[in-house]
Swiss-Prot record:
Binding site for ATP: 209-212
InterPro entries found in the cross-reference section: Bifunc_HldE, Carboh/pur_kinase_PfkB_CS, Cyt_trans-like, PfkB_dom, RfaE_dom_I, RfaE_dom_II, Ribokinase-like, Rossmann-like_a/b/a_fold
E.C. number(s) listed in UniProt: 2.7.1.167, 2.7.7.70
GO MF: ATP binding; heptose 7-phosphate kinase activity; heptose-1-phosphate adenylyltransferase activity; phosphotransferase activity, alcohol group as acceptor
Listed name of the protein: Bifunctional protein HldE
Enzyme class: transferase
Function: Catalyzes the ADP transfer from ATP to D-glycero-beta-D-manno-heptose 1-phosphate, yielding ADP-D-glycero-beta-D-manno-heptose.
Originating species: Bradyrhizobium diazoefficiens (strain JCM 10833 / BCRC 13528 / IAM 13628 / NBRC 14792 / USDA 110)
One GO BP: ADP-L-glycero-beta-D-manno-heptose biosynthetic process
Region (Ribokinase): 1-334
Active site, renumbered: 279
Length: 494
């Protein structure tokens, strides 16, 4: 059975009004990129010639960044040390308009910092150096974390616990958070690190990777069915509604407490870096569920987001636009990309076509209710050139030409219908009563109109012919008229 097309734009619109409370272990991720061409004379180890470096908000902070990049607001609660790395993280979070950070400072511990040395040519991690103290937060710091977390729960639509086992998510912090969230009816997602899943009791969803799941369940977890078989006991132990096990190139398996398990294969992509891919999955699930998506939709969004994340270098974030391109069918996107809104984009496309030696044609109209007469003209117009640009009257232009009760469909809807036609290569909306400015800009090799016009009546014929182009008149189909169709639809006689 084919997968139905997801109304991604509606989902994204809902996500934009949601807030995720993210709690967990933040860290400073540094990437040093360079080339390796020799072995050190001092020891049998490769020498990396550093060429550039990048700094990112990592760990649970990367989850927060992905929540924000996917369109939701994020409240982030984490722990830093009284050091330079902590100050850099605080400053970086302050630069994120969609993230509100509440950082608890513990002077007795360093801010977690990870430096990765990467061979740029081979996209290979050569070495990682860590600065961290993984012991659980002290009783005093625990109390400060709980005090910071509890007031934020009511402000959020969903709570996300990102556990990197660096001391923030102690059993006490987790218990206070989940109990408070459940009391307020807020779903809780946990990306777990502890093997004792009893501490996550009451969470809505657990999102372990395959290794974490296998260790926690003491199972092989090497097939979707083995994951399903091993899930029953731990779901009862954790009192959760579902478990999602991520399996890298083998996809994801969702096991809900009620209903059938679902396995989705990974989206085929060239994997460049898996750093932070789990963060992206957790964030995508959180924003989807916060927006009211069902399990299948949330799983689909998370799987697509993961495929975008692993195709990037470094601790990656995924934007709404990238996710949209990954989820929606190519044909849908191809049609959408035919609609040009900026003159610069039109000029660039025309220049590219002409560099390729392609003849550009042009026709125009209101195209309010597309009918066979329109299709015949558009098909014939495409036959007179290599690439067809359609000028579309804006809503204001149509009202001036056709009356206050037109258009029936707005300009965006009319543009989308035209763009879906194979004969049409580009749609450009114009505000004027005639397309003369657009024709002057394009200077098409062929200017096409229906045969109910004479050559002299075709707007822009002088411009086109002066530039060496031709005017093409196409025989029209009798009996088809948008005005007549509208009249009939409103109860008029045939």
């Amino acid at each position: 059975m084919p997968t139905p097309i997801l109304d991604f734009d509606a989902l994204a619109q809902t996500i934009s009004g949601r807030t995720v409370l993210c709690i967990g272990d933040i860290m400073l991720d540094e990437f040093v990129y360079g080339e390796v061409s020799r072995i050190s004379p001092e020891a049998p180890t490769p020498v990396i010639v550093a060429q550039r470096s990048e700094i990112h908000i990592g760990g649970a902070g990367n989850v927060a960044r992905n929540v924000a990049s996917l369109g939701a607001r994020c409240i982030f609660v984490g722990l830093v040390g009284e050091d330079d790395a902590g100050k850099r993280l605080a400053a970086a979070l302050a630069d994120q308009a969609a993230i509100e950070s509440v950082l608890v400072c513990d002077p007795s511990r360093p801010t977690t910092r990870k430096v990765r040395f990467v061979s740029e040519h081979f996209s290979t991690h050569m070495l990682r150096a860590d600065w961290e103290q993984a012991q659980p937060a002290s009783d005093e710091v625990e109390a400060k974390l709980i005090e910071a977390i509890l007031p934020q729960i009511a402000r959020a639509d969903i709570v996300l616990l990102s556990d990197y086992a660096k001391g923030v998510l102690t059993a006490r912090v987790i218990r206070h958070t989940i109990d408070a969230a459940r009391k307020l009816g807020k779903p809780v997602i946990v990306d777990p690190k502890s093997l004792n899943w009893a501490i996550y009791r009451g969470a809505t969803l657990l999102t372990p990777n395959r290794k974490e799941f296998a260790e926690a369940t003491r199972s092989r977890a090497d097939t979707p069915q083995s994951i399903v078989d091993a899930s029953e006991d731990v779901m009862r132990l954790a009192d959760c509604e579902a478990i999602l096990v991520t399996q890298g190139e083998h996809g994801m398996t969702l096991v809900p407490r009620n209903g059938a398990a679902v396995h989705v294969p990974a989206v085929p992509v060239k994997v460049r870096d898996v750093s932070g891919a789990g963060d992206t999955v957790a964030a995508a699930l959180a924003v989807s569920l916060a927006a009211g998506a069902d399990w299948d939709t949330a799983l689909r969004v998370a799987n697509a987001a993961a495929s975008v994340a692993v195709s990037k270098l470094g601790t990656a974030i995924v934007s709404t636009a990238e996710l949209r391109r990954k989820i929606l069918p190519h044909a849908y996107l191809a049609a959408e990309e035919k609609i040009v809104l900026e003159p610069a984009a039109l000029d660039a496309q025309l220049a590219e076509w002409r560099t390729q030696g392609l003849r550009v044609g042009f026709t125009n109209g209101c195209f309010d209710i597309l009918h066979p007469g329109h299709v015949k003209v558009l098909t014939a117009a495409r036959g007179a050139c290599d690439r067809l640009v359609v000028g579309l009257n804006s809503d204001a232009s149509v009202r001036r030409l056709k009356g206050a009760d037109r258009p029936v469909q707005d300009e965006r809807a009319r543009a989308e219908v035209l763009a879906a036609l194979e004969a049409v290569d580009l749609v450009v909306i114009f505000e004027e009563d005639t397309p003369i400015d657009l024709i002057t800009r394009i200077k098409p090799a062929a200017l096409v109109k229906g045969g109910d016009y004479t050559r002299e009546q075709v707007v822009g014929h002088e411009v086109v012919e002066a530039a060496g182009g031709v005017v093409v008149l196409v025989d029209i189909l009798q009996g088809f008229s948008t005005t007549a169709l509208v009249h009939r639809a409103r109860g008029g006689a045939k």
